[in-house]
């Protein structure tokens, strides 16, 4: 594993959330704007690393990490990349719902998750679980992570591989085995400690 960027400081998930709050409340940067910045970063790094995929499959959960994934989908569609979003939840956070609407306006294809789903080409983006994951992996998230890992395709994690604890780097059950992790705001402790380095692949901030 290699790191494209070595950080002088590592941040806890709580610290990163506080920096995010400051950006939104004190600097008055709308959350959706931050999501669009994050999504643009993910797509840029993905294309620079792997080139345009024949198919981009983005797995989305329910929170703001999913929102980033919906933005990636919309931006990819705007570049005429074939893209599908695999959805694990219809109960989205407010910001994730806004991001989904943005993807829908870009005519992104939404596919409900099914454990029998087969993805045989392209690149997979993991936008299931963010830094709020603390080690209690609900289904069908475990099934989705296993399906992602078993695909044999290049895997890109949004902010942090799903299933990895952002503070400790601990994997309680299963985590996405990413080839590339594009993280935001600050380098999370768990990316560089514990089992984190074995699951993150190259890390871009």
Q: What is each residue range found by the language model?
A:
Residues 43-128, 136-158:
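Nucleotide and nucleotide-moiety/phosphate-recognizing core
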């Amino acid at each position: 594993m290699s790191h494209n960027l070595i950080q002088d400081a590592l941040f806890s998930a709580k610290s990163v959330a506080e920096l995010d709050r400051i950006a939104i409340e004190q600097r008055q940067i709308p959350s959706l704007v931050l999501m669009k910045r994050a999504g643009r970063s993910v797509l840029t790094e993905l294309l620079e690393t792997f080139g345009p995929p024949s198919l981009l499959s983005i797995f989305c959960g329910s929170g703001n990490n999913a929102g980033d994934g919906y933005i990636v989908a919309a931006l990819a569609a705007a570049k005429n990349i074939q893209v599908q979003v695999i959805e694990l939840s219809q109960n989205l956070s407010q910001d994730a719902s806004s991001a989904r609407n943005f993807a829908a306006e870009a005519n992104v294809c939404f596919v409900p998750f099914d454990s029998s789903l087969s993805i045989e080409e392209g690149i997979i983006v993991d936008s299931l679980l963010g830094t709020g994951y603390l080690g209690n992996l609900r289904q069908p998230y475990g099934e989705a992570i296993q399906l992602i890992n078993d695909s044999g395709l290049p895997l890109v994690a949004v902010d942090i591989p799903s299933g990895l604890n952002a503070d400790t780097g601990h994997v309680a059950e299963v985590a996405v085995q990413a080839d590339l992790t594009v993280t935001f705001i600050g380098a999370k402790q768990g990316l560089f400690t514990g089992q984190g380095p074995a699951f993150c692949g190259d890390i871009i901030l």
